[in-house]
UniProtKB/Swiss-Prot annotation:
Family as reported in the entry's similarity comment: Belongs to the bacterial ribosomal protein bL9 family.
Protein name as catalogued: Large ribosomal subunit protein bL9
NCBIfam families given in the database record: L9 (TIGR00158)
Sorted UniProt keywords: Ribonucleoprotein, Ribosomal protein, RNA-binding, rRNA-binding
Length: 148
């Protein structure tokens, strides 16, 4: 019996894959649990439509990430902080950087996608990687300066 997988299953395959399974396994396990649907003509057409829509969404996200890359790689984000000689009081986190970018330039980014291994604790210039899309890494220049 041919079924279309709705969830990734270790021994069968990934989401959207059409696999051939024994009728009892499909009837008693896969179908009742919502892990698969029968591979009928209408379900196959729906799957193809869903794959096309997903590909279109991914292309749109990539194009949006490319536009964001052009903007972000040409600017330096300045973050004023209270500081001593070189050490700052507290630290600058990915969330602080995202808020400063939103406040200064009106650009909203997801702080979770900003590669910052540990919070910044010293004044200086930093180059961070932001990944809005797996194929589009963005180099963001951040300058942490003492507040006057």
């Amino acid at each position: 019996m041919k079924v279309i997988l709705l969830e990734p299953l270790e021994n069968l395959g990934d989401v959207g894959q059409v696999v051939d399974v024994k009728p009892g396994y499909a009837r008693n396990y896969l179908l009742p649990r919502g892990l698969a649907v029968l591979a009928t003509e209408s379900n196959l057409k729906a799957l193809e439509a869903r794959i096309r829509a997903q590909a279109k969404r991914l292309a749109e996200r990539k194009a949006e990430a490319e536009r964001l890359k052009e903007i972000l790689e040409n600017l330096t984000l300045t973050i004023p902080v209270r500081a001593g000689e070189t050490k700052i009081y507290g630290s600058v986190t990915a969330k602080d950087i995202a808020e400063a970018l939103s406040r200064q330039h009106g650009i909203t980014i997801d702080p979770k996608r900003l590669a910052l291994e540990k919070p910044i604790k010293e004044l200086g210039e930093y180059v961070l990687t932001y990944k809005p899309h797996p194929e589009v890494p963005i180099q963001l220049k951040v300058s942490v300066v003492a507040q006057e």
